[in-house]
Amino acid sequence: MKVTQKPKIIFIPYPAQGHVTPMLHLASAFLSRGFSPVVMTPESIHRRISATNEDLGITFLALSDGQDRPDAPPSDFFSIENSMENIMPPQLERLLLEEDLDVACVVVDLLASWAIGVADRCGVPVAGFWPVMFAAYRLIQAIPELVRTGLVSQKGCPRQLEKTIVQPEQPLLSAEDLPWLIGTPKAQKKRFKFWQRTLERTKSLRWILTSSFKDEYEDVDNHKASYKKSNDLNKENNGQNPQILHLGPLHNQEATNNITITKTSFWEEDMSCLGWLQEQNPNSVIYISFGSWVSPIGESNIQTLALALEASGRPFLWALNRVWQEGLPPGFVHRVTITKNQGRIVSWAPQLEVLRNDSVGCYVTHCGWNSTMEAVASSRRLLCYPVAGDQFVNCKYIVDVWKIGVRLSGFGEKEVEDGLRKVMEDQDMGERLRKLRDRAMGNEARLSSEMNFTFLKNELN
């Protein structure tokens, strides 16, 4: 009797922590729906995630990225771009052309758009994957209109920084919120070109899968009047490609699928902080983490924030890379961890476990999408300091639309204390968090996500 093989789906994440994590959750969701997932990452990432997840039924394959040190995760945006455009494509093409490989689809992180053309050439259906808030994609999608109206130049430079960006079903954004405005002017122009190329490549996609939920902008002013118009226009997309399928938040899928990704972190998590958290009063601890992808807030700001946290007298847990810990004020670590027992500083924290701990009262965050949704799932208030990319759009929703957080204006004692007071003492914020959690992760949201998974499964079988 011939055994029928499960159809394979190949997943190509962008090689960064905040992109690999949701892609692994997506792969596990398809595994539970009868597919055989194959996740392809650079060697350095492959080593970190494959060993601890090898028994799940997900196949992990390594891609050469041409790095001199294959054991070190890639960190520079433009060196990663060079690897993706010039080194990785032939490797994926060889895999797709293997005669005995039954590939139903290739799922490509839109930041790894190089893989779209490879799959197209091999005649394999392609789905794009947007691992962050869909509002950020809509801002990228608006690039041609931003250029046409003169808000930005042909090279992506804002003509007027104070100018407001107005889009249907979006909060008002400023030109400073544009996600390619990172680094030097030269780097910003190169990032803008990167996004233009990405947009051009998405035209051949059949679907775009998102790690967001369909009602993310329900609280935007005048939403109800424009939502139907937008849906009629989109439907999702009125029969035109690519079709938008909201599947998120994806970390919420594990409870439904009964499949748990053992480890998604590239770094060793310091579990010792959990015991310290258990000793603290409920809703008292400030948790601080500015993410994994970019250098955080800068050495001078780290020093200022450290002294402000100490002056606050509040207990805190700070996830801070060991390299950046070297820039902390002299004697700070000993004072707060030993003398006062006020806080703990770890190089990397088990974030989900931390946020679920009853002692945590608020989360000082860079507003990364994964972190934001984990905080919402745990009903944690947010004190926001966006650093790069889509984080500025996320922050706008957190503070102005959903009203589940406060934007931190600076790192001095007064700014930090004012921010903490506002976020901790808002009597209505807890209720707004509960409502958002229900909307994003409740029964209706899960049903909507499941319908989209079922639709896609039927399309691929």
UniProtKB/Swiss-Prot annotation:
It comes from Arabidopsis thaliana. Its EC number is 2.4.1.-. Pfam families: UDPGT (PF00201). Belongs to the UDP-glycosyltransferase family. One of its GO terms (molecular function) is UDP-glucosyltransferase activity. This is UDP-glycosyltransferase 82A1. InterPro entries: UDP_glucos_trans, UDP_glycos_trans_CS. It comes from the Eukaryota.
